[in-house]
């Protein structure tokens, strides 16, 4: 096919993206490294207007929900940077946000960042954050919540005190506690004070059932979906060369023609190219286990490495796996899966004919990543995720993948299984101790 003679570099420009591990350390970098989309610009304008109009009104707190890695923490840190440093507001080039920022008082707003996961309770983390902002010893702040937020309100004076609650990026483990009731209590108390409260809802507190249903009553919840990331990637990480759109269409058409299970739309494929769309689907799950995995930084770094490849060679799951493997191996919930992975890699993959080894190794990597959501994947879905296809025989790749996974299952049925879904099609996956879908 003529189009596939083109290289990735002929179609796309790969731009650098500076990855930040802590958005609160350098406000200038935090702001300059943030790319607004129409969605986040509207959200930021809305949040800024709430701060402007806060005084004298009993208004609910704000919460930002969304998949891990979608940009909630960066959004909150940008808000904090603009509130804390009035000189930075003039650097905002997004018109909607710039206009909203101009309505703020041209002075410093006190800000406190509560970092969930660093102490045993949210109350302790709140006290630590307020102690830093109020410049008081934490031991002096063992007070009722009403008094704590009263001190914060007094600190603000004529402007609201900005209280931001987010999960700490440097936490050692996933936060597994129920903070819903106390978050609701903080919101109810802040509503009577000159305190603006904004929080990030991670999966451990985002449920709308049980005790955490209190959050939906106490907060105005905005949702930041992955569509935002598609737009950032397309505009700021992988801008396409306009004269090569026909070539890119040809690449997509080629994949769809030879991979019937390639289910992603052309719009989505084009936005993310040269990154496989499946990566955005596994990114939140990877981020759950590897806290410092940053999709945009990964995309920029991986993109720079594949510029010389053929146009149909996408950044794939194997590159994600290679980047995060060492960190995933440290996760207790994945210990058994990696023990099985190592055994299969050594005793099964290593003994296959040379021509089959590379594909089998790639299947093993993909299967482990794709199993982490607990649902399992069909042979067709694995083919589409890894771009396995045979131009002369479209059924051959499906059979090869199914045969390869069957070899894994026969070797270690206690670790990998194939389970029929409602349609009768087999879904394959590693058995993970904390996932019930496939298990």
What is each stretch, according to the model?
Residues 149-151, 209-306:
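Amphipathic alpha-helical segments of the small helical/lid subdomains adjacent to P-loop NTPase cores
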Residues 170, 186-211:
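Sensor-1/coupling segment of RecA-like P-loop NTPase cores
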Residues 148-154, 181-198, 236:
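Substrate-engagement module of ASCE P-loop NTPases
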Residues 58, 80-110, 136-146, 201, ...:
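Flexible phosphate/Mg2+-sensing switch loops adjacent to catalytic phosphate-binding sites
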């Amino acid at each position: 096919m003529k189009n596939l003679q083109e290289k990735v570099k002929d179609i796309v420009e790969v731009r650098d993206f500076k990855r930040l591990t802590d958005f609160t350390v350098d406000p200038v970098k935090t702001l300059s490294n943030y790319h607004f989309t129409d969605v986040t610009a509207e959200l930021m304008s809305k949040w800024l207007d709430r701060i402007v109009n806060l005084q004298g009104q009993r208004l609910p707190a704000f919460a930002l929900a969304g998949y891990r890695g979608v940009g909630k923490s960066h959004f909150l840190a940008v808000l904090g940077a603009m509130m804390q440093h009035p000189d930075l507001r003039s650097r905002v080039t997004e018109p909607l946000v710039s206009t909203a920022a101009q309505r703020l008082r041209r002075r410093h707003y006190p800000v406190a960042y509560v970092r969930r996961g660093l102490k045993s309770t949210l109350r302790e983390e709140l006290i630590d954050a307020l102690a830093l902002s109020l410049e008081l010893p934490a031991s002096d702040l063992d007070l009722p919540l009403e008094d704590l937020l009263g001190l914060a309100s007094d600190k603000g004076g004529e402007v609201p005190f900005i209280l931001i609650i987010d999960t700490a990026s440097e936490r050692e483990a996933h936060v597994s506690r129920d903070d819903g009731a106390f978050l609701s209590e903080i919101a109810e108390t802040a509503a009577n004070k000159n305190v603006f409260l904004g929080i990030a809802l991670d999966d451990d507190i985002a449920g709308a059932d049980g005790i955490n249903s209190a959050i939906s009553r106490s907060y105005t919840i905005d949702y930041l979906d992955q569509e935002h990331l598609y737009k950032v990637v397309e505009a700021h990480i992988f801008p396409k060369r306009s004269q090569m759109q026909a070539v890119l269409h040809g690449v997509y058409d080629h994949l769809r023609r030879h991979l019937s299970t390639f289910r992603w739309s052309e719009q989505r494929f084009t936005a993310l190219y040269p990154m496989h769309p499946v990566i955005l689907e596994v990114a939140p799950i990877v981020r759950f286990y590897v806290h410092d995995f940053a999709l945009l930084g990964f995309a920029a770094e991986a993109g720079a490495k594949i510029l010389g490849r053929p146009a149909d060679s996408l950044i794939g799951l194997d590159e994600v796996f290679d980047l995060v493997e060492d960190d995933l191996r440290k996760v207790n919930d994945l210990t058994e899966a990696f023990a099985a992975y190592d055994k299969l890699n050594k005793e099964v993959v290593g003994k296959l004919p040379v021509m089959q080894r590379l594909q089998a190794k790639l299947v093993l990597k993909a299967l482990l990543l794709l199993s982490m959501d607990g649902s399992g994947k069909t042979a067709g879905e694995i083919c589409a995720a890894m771009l396995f296809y045979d131009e002369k025989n479209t059924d051959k790749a499906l059979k090869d993948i199914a045969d390869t996974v069957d070899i894994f299952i026969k070797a270690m049925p206690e670790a990998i299984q194939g389970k029929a879904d409602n349609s009768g099609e087999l879904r394959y996956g590693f058995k993970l101790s904390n996932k019930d879908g496939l298990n």
